[in-house]
């Protein structure tokens, strides 16, 4: 839903494919060869009308999962931090695809850590990234916050909004007003950084403090 706000997108899961192609188990149709021409034709037709196709793999390393992996130009790992990384088999397959791909055609691998809430500071992120290396980027989202999904959608569609705050000692307090002006005009901030006093403001914003909290 959030992705469709920025670019026409289509979500495709194994269940949806089986419903559309009237098959009981697409894994059987794909078989060990990993090809099923009605599926290829179906996805080709979809791609004519949508900018992005989101493919949902299975947790196991199945023919459907392999088909998705071979077709994808970006891997998005959704991780529940309370469970950690459990699908090592799929990761191994993706690593093999990367090894067999010319460097200039390598697929981006990005980690999305899905929190029930973000009241607590994230932990073990570096461990997750090390297990999935090479990772081009990682994001923390609150699955109950639509704004976080909108931020992720902007990032995926290359429409993210970044702000860099400059230094200036006490004058850096003016950044609070600049931040409030952005919010008042409905301009979200997806990426934030700064130098000197600006870095302090960037850290406060990245921590999710409201304007009222900042002022107090």
Task: Please tell me what each predicted stretch does.
Residues 1-25, 46, 152, 197-198:
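Walker A/P-loop phosphate-binding motif and the immediately C-terminal alpha-helix
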Residues 12, 110-114, 191-193:
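Short internal beta-strands
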Residues 25-35, 83:
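Flexible beta-alpha connector loops of hexameric P-loop NTPases
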Residues 36, 42-43, 48-137:
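Conserved catalytic-core segment of NTP-binding enzymes
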Residues 107-108, 156-161:
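A short, charged/proline- and glycine-enriched loop
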Residues 121, 134-158:
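C-terminal helix of von Willebrand factor
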Residues 162-164, 169-216:
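Patatin-like phospholipase
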């Amino acid at each position: 839903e959030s992705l469709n706000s920025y670019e026409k997108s289509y979500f495709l899961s194994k269940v949806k494919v089986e419903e559309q192609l009237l098959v009981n188990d697409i894994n059987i149709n794909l078989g060990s060869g990993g090809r099923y021409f009605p599926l290829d034709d179906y996805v080709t037709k979809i791609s004519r009308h949508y900018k992005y196709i989101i493919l949902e793999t299975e947790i196991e390393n199945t023919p459907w999962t392999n088909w998705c992996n071979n077709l994808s130009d970006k891997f998005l790992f959704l991780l529940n931090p309370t469970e950690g990384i459990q699908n090592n088999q799929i990761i191994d397959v993706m690593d093999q695809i990367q090894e067999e791909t010319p460097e200039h055609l390598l697929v981006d691998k990005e980690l999305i850590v899905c929190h029930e809430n973000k009241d607590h500071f994230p932990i073990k992120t570096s461990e997750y990234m090390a297990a999935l290396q090479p990772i081009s980027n990682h994001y923390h989202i609150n699955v109950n916050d639509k704004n976080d999904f909108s931020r992720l959608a902007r990032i995926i569609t290359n429409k993210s909004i970044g702000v860099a705050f400059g230094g200036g000692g006490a004058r850096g307090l003016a950044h609070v007003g600049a931040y409030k002006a952005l919010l008042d005009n409905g301009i979200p901030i997806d990426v934030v950084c700064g130098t000197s006093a600006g870095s302090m403001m960037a850290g406060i914003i990245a921590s999710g403090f409201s304007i009222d909290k900042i002022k107090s």
